[in-house]
Amino acid sequence: MAVPAIETKMPIPVTRADAALGAEIGVDLSRTLSDDTFAEIEAAFHDNIVVCFRRQTLTNEQHIDFSRRFGELEIHIVKKYLLPGYPEILLISNVRNEAGELIGLADAGFTWHSDTSYRQFPSRCSLLYAKEVPHRDGVALGDTVFANTIAAYEALPAATKRRIEGRRAIHRYSERRRVPGSPRPKLTAAQLAETPDIAHPIVRTHPYTGRKALYVTAGECVGIEGVPDNEAVPLIAELDAWCVRPEFLYRHRWQVGDLLMW
């Protein structure tokens, strides 16, 4: 009977990106992690917001087991692209099978959003594992860009902070922006019933670090409670544009074997 390899206790290597967020963590996630090592990973995640574990060789079970250490796993509402036998894993892909059908969600990340902000209790984090990465002329494609909305909030003019204090934006999954001709399947009536409008504070306090962040995107926020639409929609657009200023961004360039967590 094989015995799982157990890592020895050493400080984990964390290399920060030259950006407003992001870091690489040098840990082999296929090994059994002690509670102390996991605590270091968790702290690095909280400090850097987006973390990447390079050169991973994970089974589906290992991917799920590591993810579960951060909390209860969710099943994505788009059931069509759940990995058979592993419903905790959603396939992201633009590859088509022999019948010409997409094998995964092809437009994920095409617009700015915060995962599952349309739920009453949004996800704590997401973990995306790169099994294949497209290339053209030797250059990897499909970069993913992230925004540090903590830094964005902290840099807001004082007048804007006062304007949004105590306000709640209305998130609507069915209004998420789509690229023209998006192949994403439309939600059924039952799925729409699962995702009613949800209001979250525009300035959201992180439950683990206590830091304040902007929590609003033009991609799926349709209004602000108690504010007329002719004022709310421009304000949402203004905050959205502020969050994605270059000084708040990190661009992740994918490699096969990356496990990216945000």
Predicted regions located by residue number:
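Non-heme Fe(II) oxygenase catalytic core, chiefly the N-lobe of the double-stranded beta-helix
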Residues: 2-259
